[in-house]
Regions:
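N-terminal loops that bind phosphate or other acidic moieties
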Residues: 1-203
């Protein structure tokens, strides 16, 4: 297998593993401020990608990322499926277009696309409250361990926020005091990806 085939396959396995290990907790977080399905949704998406990992790892990296995004849209469902799907499809497209060979530029454009899709911005207690800080760290070319740490602390910071988007917004003030499930899944995935890259690739 080529290096990037091993990379794609390994990253898919690492993401699937972390979501499987935390699916119950993600659903528990979603039970507090949503409808309790976020762990099930994320697990379904990651299992579908994992089942097709050989096909993805045959593709050029940018195409694999885009196709994984499409699979996530079709399998995660809920509000988070189209958002995670948009993120990956946009990263893949931007990398493939070549004009943005730089990963941080592709990520920045993709995070903007997620924000447009969710009509959301920073501070509204969603997965964007992890994506934006991660994007900032990537732009500054911080070390992988720093990116992972920032993702974790950013998810924790959603505890104090009032939800303004998605189901949790129906709770208004009562959403304060709970961590946003999408922010948590986003931190878990970021952390799994950073740790995998740190172990298998120079930063
Ligand atoms: P659903 O809310 O449809 O049950 P999930 O439970 O899978 O979907 O996902 C909920 C997560 O999706 C939230 O915790 C939040 O992070 C994210 N989310 C929901 N709506 C939006 C939005 N409009 N913009 C950004 N993120 C959102
Ligand atoms: Mg839900």
């Amino acid at each position: 297998m080529r290096d990037d085939q091993v990379l794609v396959s390994g990253l898919i396995a690492a993401c699937r593993e972390i979501i499987a290990a935390h699916a119950d907790h993600l659903s528990e977080l979603d039970r507090a401020i949503g409808d309790g399905d976020h762990g099930t949704n994320m697990r379904r998406g990651c299992e579908a990608v994992y089942a097709d990992r050989d096909r993805f790892s045959q593709m050029p990296l940018a195409q694999a990322i885009e196709e994984i995004g499409l699979t996530l849209v079709l399998t995660i469902g809920g509000a988070s499926g189209p958002l995670y799907g948009t993120l990956l499809m946009e990263i893949g497209r931007r990398l493939a277009a070549g004009g943005e060979a730089d990963f941080s530029a592709a990520l920045t454009g993709a995070v903007e696309a997620v924000a447009r899709r969710g009509r959301a911005q920073r501070g509204e207690k969603t997965l964007l409250d992890v994506l934006y800080p991660v994007q900032d760290e990537v732009i500054r070319r911080h070390a992988l361990s720093a990116i992972a740490e920032r993702a974790e602390t950013s998810a924790t910071l959603t505890v104090g926020m009032k939800a303004l988007r998605g189901r949790a917004s129906f709770l208004g003030e009562r959403s304060i005091g709970h961590m946003d499930p999408g922010a948590r899944s986003c931190a878990l995935l970021t952390s799994a990806i950073c740790h995998y890259l740190k172990e298998h690739r120079a930063a």
